[in-house]
Swiss-Prot record:
Signal sequence range: 1-21
Native species: Avena sativa (Oat)
Listed name of the protein: Thaumatin-like pathogenesis-related protein 2
Gene this chain is encoded by: RASTL-2
A Pfam family assignment: Thaumatin
InterPro entries: Osmotin/thaumatin-like_sf, Thaumatin, Thaumatin_CS
Keyword Signal listed: yes
Entry's transmembrane regions: none
Top-rank lineage group of the source organism: Eukaryota
GO terms of biological process kind: defense response to fungus; killing of cells of another organism
């Protein structure tokens, strides 16, 4: 019995060492409040001007999105936003338009990330990986972003990296 418990503990330790969460630091440099939203991780929250907050995203998360909502008013988790609204919910389960999107997949040994304005543009954004290229999007024509589904704008990053998203850099 003790041997099987030791083997189980060892296997769990090896698995946990190979799978690590990524930390996304979200900073609002805008002169107004932004309500960041994220799917499938992050939900939604208020981020006042000059504030930052962290979101931990587990390894294996694919097709993730984080965006900033503007002009929002909420009461008990329900309300609306002028841009990036997600069906009137504070905690989002889908993305709304228009919204500048930070998109990501957190893999094992390699992650992928990009900025997309396919669903519209609403906020200037920087999106960077601690071991990769810094992406910048200052307007709807930003060259670092996806504008059409067939564009090639995805970047790779080493696994176990952390990320920075800055609104109004």
């Amino acid at each position: 019995m003790a041997t099987s418990s030791a083997v189980l503990f060892f296997l769990l330790a090896v698995f946990a060492a190979g799978a690590s969460a990524a930390t996304f630091r979200i900073t609002n440099n805008c002169g107004f409040t932004v309500w960041p939203a994220g799917i499938p991780v992050g939900g939604g929250f208020q981020l006042n001007s000059k504030q930052s907050s962290n979101i931990n995203v587990p390894a294996g998360t694919s097709a993730g999105r984080i965006w900033g909502r503007t002009g929002c008013s909420f009461n008990n988790g329900r309300g609306s936003c002028a841009t990036g609204d997600c069906a009137g919910a504070l905690s989002c389960t889908l993305s709304g338009q228009p919204a500048t999107l930070a998109e990501y997949t957190i893999g094992g040994s390699q992650d992928f990330y990009d900025i997309s304005v396919i669903d519209g543009y609403n906020l200037a954004m920087d999106f960077s990986c601690s071991t990769g290229v810094a992406l910048k999007c200052r307007d709807a024509n930003c060259p670092d972003a996806y504008h059409h589904p067939n564009d090639v704008a995805t970047h790779a990053c080493n696994g176990n990296s952390n990320y920075q998203i800055t609104f109004c850099p």
